[in-house]
Amino acid sequence: MKPSKIKPIVFSAIAFLLMIITLACVFSLVFFHIQHKDTPGTSQSRPSTADPTPSSPVPTSSETPTEPLSSPSVSSSETLPVSGEPSPSIPEGDFVLKKTEDAGLDYQNRIVFLGDSTTYGMLPNMVLPDKADSKQVLHGAGGTLSLPNVTTNLIYAGSSTEGKLLGEYLSEVKPEILVITLGVGVSDSLNESRFSSYYKLVIDTVLSSSPNTKIICNSIYPVCQARDESYQHLNNPDIAKANAWIGKVAQGYYESGKKVYYLDSYSLLLGSDGYMPSPYSNGDGLHLSKAAFEIVLGTIRTHKVPD
């Protein structure tokens, strides 16, 4: 065969080979994308029990934590179905706060709230007198605070960027009443012994730093159905179980002569279907809306701690 005829054949073969390689690469990329595409239940990572040490200022009223805390458009006076039944397995006794006359805003203003992102939501929802700057709200960096790290991580008051250890802060402020709402992020990952030991460490820190402070161990709030189903590690049965542990912890301190009480706000935010009604959530199924916070605050005022 003449050289002049060989060259076109070689070039055609090379072009054909390059086309085959290109098509193979395209099919490989498409296959890889399909295999790794997010699907419900597989793209959610399990939350860490660690709460990072602050590396940047705590969010101000114009900033928000990782999870959105904006309130849906719902009237705070809207009536929604609630179960009205106490959380399962909560022991009965005088340590469980009973309904009283409304103690009023003066009573509410004497309270300090310590909690995770479900408490931090009080700031952007502006449900307290000082709104987004309220020093009544104690939280961790970025608005989050995990139960195992409450006594070792820095705590921030309101929009302040000055963090202090919990014991240090309480020694200075010595609040009359402290409402603790903690445990939602670890309600499924810790057994009763470990959960209770972390919770007791928080209470012991409060009592040693401010002995006259009355402590309200507030129940963990329920979640909406969509959150329960999409985050299988965060569900109402586990939350109810953890609330029973919190109740037992409060009972132990109360029976030893300490002014430690339990408040069941869980059942007040639980719908008849076993989930938190969606208007009580800010839209993510976990954090509360302004309407829900107003219910919680109203419950605190109408379940006054004994003098």
Feature locations, PLM:
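Generic structural signal for well-ordered alpha-helices
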Residues: 199-204, 243, 247
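Active-site segments of SGNH/GDSL-like serine hydrolases
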Residues: 181-185, 207-240
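Conserved SGNH/GDSL esterase-like catalytic core that processes O-acyl groups on lipids
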Residues: 104-197
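Loop/turn elements at helix/coil->beta-strand transitions in domains of secreted/extracellular proteins
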Residues: 107-110, 133, 173-178, 210-216, ...
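Histidine-centered active-site loop/cap adjacent to the catalytic His
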Residues: 280-307
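Substrate-gating cap/lid alpha-helix
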Residues: 224-265, 286, 291
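Extracytoplasmic/secreted cell-surface and envelope-processing proteins
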Residues: 122, 187-192, 224-232, 270-274
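N-terminal secretory targeting modules
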Residues: 1-114, 118-124
